[in-house]
């Protein structure tokens, strides 16, 4: 398995647009050969502090967004070749729409499974 984790910081006023775009991208990805799983996650909670984690307290729901909204892509494909085949058409189809919604370029982590 080969994984991509991508962290996006979106403009607050573009939340609806980027979430619709994520649904379209996920739908496209799932039709492509070698794609196993696609998930987009919106950051909605945070930990109070480390002591609250040790005490087993639940995370706190975010009540407001300041300047940006954080999203994460979790993508699993069969191998590096499947990822390469997916990246090119994905960028060609969606890149301009992504850039309109983001405050900065995404942080991308690529790698293989350990467990």
Model feature map: region roles:
Residues 1-2, 65-68:
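Short, flexible turn/loop "capping" segments at secondary-structure junctions
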Residues 3-9, 72-74:
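Active-site-flanking beta-strand signature of metal-NTP-handling nucleotidyl enzymes
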Residues 16-19, 78-89:
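Short amphipathic alpha-helices within nucleic acid-binding modules
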Residues 22, 86-87, 95-98:
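Short, flexible helix/strand-to-coil boundary loops that buttress conserved ligand/catalytic motifs
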Residues 22-25, 29:
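Hydrophobic alpha-helical core bundles mediating ligand binding, dimerization, or RNAP-core interactions
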Residues 31-34:
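Glycine-centered tight turns that cap/initiate beta-strands
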Residues 36-66, 93-115:
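Glycine-rich beta-strand-turn "strand-cap" elements at beta-sheet edges
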């Amino acid at each position: 398995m080969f994984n991509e984790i991508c962290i996006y910081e979106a403009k607050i006023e573009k939340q609806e647009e980027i979430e619709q775009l994520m649904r379209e991208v996920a739908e496209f990805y799932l039709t492509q050969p070698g794609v196993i799983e696609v998930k987009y996650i919106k950051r909605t909670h945070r930990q109070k502090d480390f002591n609250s984690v040790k005490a087993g307290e639940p995370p706190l729901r975010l009540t407001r967004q300041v300047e940006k909204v954080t999203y994460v892509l979790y993508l699993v494909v069969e191998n590096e070749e499947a990822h390469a085949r997916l990246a090119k058409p994905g960028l060609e189809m969606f890149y301009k729409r992504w850039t309109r919604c983001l405050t900065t370029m995404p942080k991308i982590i690529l790698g293989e499974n350990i467990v």
